[in-house]
Regions:
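Intrinsic-disorder-associated, low-complexity terminal segments enriched in Asp/Asn/His/Tyr and depleted
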Residues: 16-19, 31, 39, 43
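Compositionally biased, low-complexity segments
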Residues: 1-2, 30
Length: 366
């Protein structure tokens, strides 16, 4: 019996097949083709979203963190889940930070860890900026609201460099080793200047040198020294494992994005629960933007003289705001903690813009 192809080219049927069978075949082919088209469309959408996230990783992390907090805090049936999971996510942050620093330090060049002149110049600038804020607080601190805003700016100037600064610096093309050394030096300076200046800002702030020394020592040891030593030992005894870690592109950076999402959620929570309002709240959110731009600009300006504008800009501009918030809540006016929380947003928007510009044009504009 002669066969002929079906009009859709997917099946063959005999002349004696009923039109009903043919119709079923036709519908089946349409279903298969539509499923294939749906899968291709779905994959295309996923790739477009992923490429968008890669291009704007830091701003996307900020938005995801903020929106995620708002959903789980204000959608009634999701509130219990948010209250249960939130603390666990926050407790996970130090673990992720440790892991991302280990991954980053696997790529470190020991010869780059030699202290540089700009490391100490930036510490003097950082201390001078903090002292300038202390003078302004002495001058205009009689007004409660003015003092609150100045305290917010003060903590943004004085808090040390972020431990994860090397991750963003690596993507921008700076030196991981040099930033690691700078971060250690910055924490040592912190041990001296915070106990010295905090009592001038808040007379009730009794910060002993011993207490601050132990806090800084614990911070430097657990966050920086241990992952650095593990990375160096891994390079010596587990070179194949290190090669596999290094082969995963931007692994440490995406770990940082995960932490940033959680940090942004916590920042939004602090801002929404702040008992200040109106122009005072607006200023506590806006002043850190100018502090952020000033520090990035000064750092880059100093770094240009040492062929290290990227590293120096990140060193002075990217702050450990978690420590800043803790210091404010513990020793200063707790309401001023809104400022270092806002600084998280501004510094990551600056970094996000720098990363976008470098990927688009192959160089940094600033």
């Amino acid at each position: 019996m002669k066969e002929k192809s079906s009009p859709i080219g997917c099946f063959r049927y005999g002349e004696d097949l009923s039109y009903c069978t043919f119709a079923l075949e036709f519908l089946l082919c349409l279903d298969l083709q539509s499923n294939g088209l749906f899968n291709r469309t779905q994959n295309h959408v996923i790739m477009k979203l992923w490429n968008f996230f890669r291009k704007f990783s830091l701003p996307c992390s900020l938005v995801i963190g903020a929106v995620g907090y708002l959903i789980f805090a204000y959608v009634p049936f999701l509130e219990p889940l948010g209250e249960a999971v939130g603390p666990h996510l926050i407790s996970l942050m130090p673990v992720v930070l440790f892991a991302l620093l280990y991954v980053t330090f696997c790529k470190i060049e020991i010869k780059e860890m030699k202290p540089k002149a700009w490391h100490f110049i930036l510490q003097l600038i950082r201390t001078s900026l903090a002292l300038m804020m202390v003078v302004l607080i002495f001058e205009f601190g009689n007004d409660y609201n003015t003092k609150l805003i100045l305290e917010g700016a003060f903590i943004c100037f004085i808090c040390p460099t972020a431990a994860a600064v090397a991750v963003v610096t690596e993507k921008l093309g700076g030196s991981i080793g040099s930033l690691t050394t700078y971060t250690v030096i910055a924490n040592i300076f912190t041990m001296v200047i915070i106990p010295s200046l905090f009592p001038m800002v808040e007379k009730g702030a009794d910060v002993s040198f011993l207490y601050m020394s132990l806090m800084v020592f614990r911070n430097v040891t657990t966050v920086l020294v241990v992952p650095l030593l593990l990375a160096l030992l891994s390079r010596r005894f587990l070179p194949k494992f290190v090669d596999k870690v290094k082969s995963v592109k931007d692994l440490g950076f995406y770990m940082w994005c995960f932490n940033l999402t959680i940090l942004m959620g916590e920042t939004v929570r602090n801002i929404l629960h702040a008992t200040v309002s109106g122009w005072i709240l607006v200023l506590l959110l806006i002043v850190p933007l100018f502090v952020c731009l000033i520090q990035f600009a000064i750092g880059k300006a100093v770094g240009r003289h040492f062929d290290a504008s990227i590293s120096a800009g990140q060193a002075l501009g990217q702050k450990n705001t978690i420590v800043g918030i803790w210091l404010t809540l513990t020793f200063l006016n707790p309401l001023a903690a809104v400022a270092p929380g806002a600084y998280v947003v501004w510094q990551n928007l600056v970094n996000g813009w720098q990363l976008w510009y470098k990927e688009k044009y192959g160089k940094l504009k600033w």
